[in-house]
Structures are given as C-alpha cells and as structure tokens.
C-alpha cells in the first residue's frame, strides 16, 4: 500500500536528444553562465529553485539527498542518463568505514587512531587531496554517516572477515567493510526498472565476502553448501515468496532509493549539467538540460554538490592525463563516466589533483561483447601466474588489484607488459570458474575468438602468444617448486590473509599457490583496467571545492570520483571508493546546513 504513495518515475525523451541539444546550444551564449568565480552577475533569472542541487545519482548523490531531507533542506538530484545509480550500481557495493557500528556490534577492536595509523602507512604523502585534515574528517564522519543511515532505516552488515588490502601493515588487521543486507527491490515498485544494470546484476543475492565461496563450490563441500544456500534459500526461496532479492551495488542503490522515497524525493533523469552559474564569486546554481528538451536555470540557494563520477570513459581526457597505453575500453565504469562535471568544475577555476591515477585492476576483454571483466579472484587462485612479454613474473598476482594495475604500468616502462598474460593449467580450469566460463568447460567460441589460447605444451603456448618459451618454462618450473614448498620467494604471494581470502584452502601448503603442471595449458591477455578514475576536483575537509586561489569556492561542493581521492594513490580496503564518496557527500550537506553561505 505504501508504494502507491510514491511518485512514478517521470518519462522523458531519449538521451540522444540531450546530446543533440547540447551540441546546438552554446553554453557561453547564456549571459548567466560565468566562466570564472570572479565574474559577477546579479541579474540571473532562474526557472527553478531548490536548497541543494545534487549532480549525480550514485551512492554519494542518494546519500546526500537523504541527508538533505533529514535536515529539512530541499534537494534536487539531476542525472544525465536515463538510469539511476551510476557506477555504484555496477559495483560490489561495499563501504570501507573504519570504527563502524556493525564492526563494533560483533566485537571488532577498532578505533580512529588505529585506522589512521593504517591509512597513513597505505597513503603516505599524496598531496592535499589526502591531507591530514581530510583523512581525519573521513574517519570521524564515516561512522556518523552509517549511524545516520541506520536511523533512516538502512539495513547493513559487516562484510564477514573480508580483510583490508594490506593487512600486514600496522593497523591493518581489523576488517572494516560494510554492505547492505539483501533488499527486496519490489519495495520500490517501478523505480527498480530505472536502476542501472551491469554484469553483477545477474548474480544470485551474494554478499561481497561470499563471492569466493561461489568460485570454490566445485572443490569444497562446505563452499558447495554455502553456494546452494545463496542460490537456493536466499535467491529462489525469496523469489517464491514474491520478492526480488538484490545485493551488492544494485542492492545499495535500491535501498537508498527506498529510503529517499519515504521523503519528498526530486530527481530529473536525462538532465545533464551544462554549466555552473556564478554570482559575485559564489556558485548560486546551474544550467541543466532538463529531459533533453530545454536549458533550465536552477537556483541552488544553499549549494551545489557535484557527485557525478570521473572520466574513465573519456578517451581524450585519458590520453591527456594517463600514462600510455590507455583506453576507455578497459574500464568497468559505466558508459556515462565522461568527466564532463570535472571539466565544468575546472571552468570555474577549481583546482585538479591526481588526474593521472585511477582505481586500477587487471582485466580481460570479452571478444564478443567487448566488455572488460575485472580479475578479482581468478589471479589469486592456485595453478595460475601472470607473466610479461618476456615470459617472466613481475608481481604477486594475488595482491590488491589497484597495486597489481600499477605494477603492470611500472613493468611496462622496462619490459612490455601491456598486455600481460595470465597462464593457467588444467587443474585451474577443472576446479574454478574463469570469468564467465564454469569449471571443466572452455567453450569452443572462446578458443576460436582468441580470447583464450590453449596448448598441450608450454613451449607451443609460448610460441602462440609470442613470449620467450625458455623463460616461460623456467618461470613455471620455479613457481612450481615454490608452490610445493608453500612460499613465494620472489614476490610473497600467499603470505597474508588478503592473498589467502580468495585462494583455495583445500590446496596445501599455501592456498594461493599451486604448480602449473597439468596439460593442456591456457593463456589469456590481461590489461590494466580500472573501476573508475581517481583524480578530479580538489576538495577540503568540508567537501568544498578549492579554487586556484587556494580558497574554497563558495557554494560549490564535490565528492566521489568527481574529486581527487582522500586515499591518494592507494586502495586500503574493499569499499575505499564508495565509503569516502558517501561520507564526503554527508559532510557536504552537514556543512551546507550549518553555514548560510
């Protein structure tokens, strides 16, 4: 019954119309649109008004809208695509929040001091984006943000024992990731059809710390039972009861939508930001192309919050800022992640930082769809290694994906390593899935397309993929010897709990190591993909955008991948993208509420 009270999603014309209109309308033809915060314009005539204008509908945008409602601030969310959720909806949906209420409830011994020690060891000196003030603001407000969500009805959980990505560092021994519990998407009615879909959307309602169990379900009775419970009771069982169970990033977005819909939730879809409106050095609103039909001047009485992602899909910006080779074809970010909001922010003299960085991760490309597949688990499982063009290993394959991506670029400066090759034997293919291929089955189409190369000998495999056969053979032999002893003397693979988390405990003496010894052997190209870019607008501890003057631009806030990350060039743990995004959007709204700027 409650669902009938919710407004139905508005219908708008197609996204192509937005691009068409945007190409026809010169932003500078509108006198109200300032090119710098110093430009004065006191005669703007606005078409719409709100307290807070939120640009972007991912986790950060929806969390900000909810906070606005709770603080009696009227908000308007504008989303340039026809779908809600951004890259958040495509993600695992985890939030890395130290000292959080869910961890405390299960007895975790964490503190701000402990987490700061860990962050400092991970991040080091990464410039003003990761300043001491911003680190502390994040650590103090992350738990408050989660407590606020719980007060609003959010149902979350600690993500099992999902470890930090560098558990061996001081302060790294306490798991800190939180995620939403299984959510019934039927609660939001027709709005669920507007949530962005991605590769993870078709998965059963699994939690982030359970994904490894699905991968190992063919090798372990306990994991098989766990997988059966996930797919059966939690999945089919709930569907039989008329539910639509969702988890991960899609579940997070659906639950945040549900909480927003309890309030007066205002969102314009297919309504991209065209420019910011500045009066007397203060951002007072924006020009929005509403529904692709006409430019609308929206006054933001209290502030504008930019939370519309990064520039992972923008080829020109990637070539301008990122190390070569780079391409948007390797990213897992959604197709609208074009950096337009960063460019518009830069147009009002905002500083940029960390523009050369991203949330890296080894990926393979599906030859049929052209879409990347992020190698989170495959490279941590036994009976696999990654080699460069010379046939040699160059990293701990099981380590944090961000570090692994960085190492691919570092290696490539000396030895061609883009693409690298992941080498598997039949033990790996028999026991574990690889991307979308189930255990024991390698489709002929995958072989025919060249996605995966197969051979009965390592020498022939090396010749097929163009690497030095002797080096590959020597590398495999040495790796096998170390695997049998259980110690990777070259790169330390399997030496910490994160490496082991996605390994196979059935393999002894080290669940992340296993000889490559059983033919046929396989090879797949590996590229330095990413989950999105890490650089953007420079912000302070209040999420205010910093101008080139070194001072905050009044009225302008930003969070998430639109900004330079508080994590610097590091990735401390699962959810270290979404956690800060939602925390700093929470901080932004709090600052807006306290300051009548």
Feature-to-residue mapping (PLM):
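N-terminal chloroplast transit peptides
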Residues: 1-17
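Generic low-complexity segments that are intrinsically disordered, proline-rich and/or Lys/Arg-biased
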Residues: 8-10, 21-23, 38, 164, ...
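Residues forming the flavin
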Residues: 22-113, 176-179, 183, 189-597
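Dinucleotide-binding Rossmann-like beta1-alpha1 core, especially the glycine-rich loop
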Residues: 102-106, 110-193, 197, 201
